[in-house]
């Protein structure tokens, strides 16, 4: 991918919103990325926000401003405000909670249909892959009907275990790559 600093200015921070149903593991992902260790969390009432300079992978050194928005039903109407004008969306899914995948799908499709979010790169983190009975990535992709998202939405499904950090670096690298491609595409459209 070349020199990262030529792709994103050192002074620029990517705006990333983390969404998903309650108990999917969003806050665990956030603090694993920030501290590179497990931090015991409590349900998010409202949101958490952190500026994090990524420390691993292709996106190493890139500064990101993360917004981790609570996933309880009463907080979901706020998702639209927090996801407006974002560089990327991370949608965390509990790979074991099969009973709530339909609900996760409905909420994800709502978010990606907001006019402001059309075409925004999407990283789906299939969390809790370390647990027995976790669904494989292909099944999660199918259950979430990702193929039905608008064609402009690029996405990647990343198997992960937020508690130990497995898969998070790879997922962030993929999200960063999708953000760069989108920016390049938007820049080319402006030139026309």
Curated annotation (Swiss-Prot):
Residues covalently joined to lipid (N-myristoyl glycine): 2
Residues at which GTP binds: 20-27, 68-72, 127-130
GO annotation, cellular component aspect: cytoplasm; cytosol; filopodium; mitochondrion; nucleus; plasma membrane
GO terms, molecular function: alpha-tubulin binding; GTP binding; GTPase activity
UniProt keyword GTP-binding present: yes
InterPro entries, sorted: P-loop_NTPase (IPR027417), Small_GTP-bd (IPR005225), Small_GTPase_ARF (IPR024156), Small_GTPase_ARF/SAR (IPR006689)
UniProt GO BP: endocytic recycling; intracellular protein transport
Induction: By liver X-receptor/retinoid X receptor agonists or cholesterol loading.
Pfam families per the UniProt record, alphabetical: Arf
Matches recorded under CDD domains: Arl4_Arl7
PROSITE patterns cross-referenced by the UniProt entry: ARF
Tissue expression pattern: Expressed in several tumor cell lines (at protein level). Expressed in lung, brain, leukocytes and placenta.
Subcellular location: Cell projection, Filopodium; Cell membrane; Cytoplasm
Keywords for the protein's UniProt record, in alphabetical order: Cell membrane, Cell projection, Cytoplasm, GTP-binding, Lipoprotein, Membrane, Myristate, Nucleotide-binding, Transport
NCBIfam families attached to this UniProt entry: small_GTP
PANTHER family documented for this protein: ADP RIBOSYLATION FACTOR-RELATED (PTHR11711)
Oligomer and partners: Interacts with CYTH2. Interacts with alpha tubulin; interaction is independent on the ARL4C GTP or GDP binding status.
Family per record: Belongs to the small GTPase superfamily. Arf family.
Function description: Small GTP-binding protein which cycles between an inactive GDP-bound and an active GTP-bound form, and the rate of cycling is regulated by guanine nucleotide exchange factors (GEF) and GTPase-activating proteins (GAP). GTP-binding protein that does not act as an allosteric activator of the cholera toxin catalytic subunit. May be involved in transport between a perinuclear compartment and the plasma membrane, apparently linked to the ABCA1-mediated cholesterol secretion pathway. Recruits CYTH1, CYTH2, CYTH3 and CYTH4 to the plasma membrane in the GDP-bound form.
Protein name: ADP-ribosylation factor-like protein 4C
Organism (species): Homo sapiens
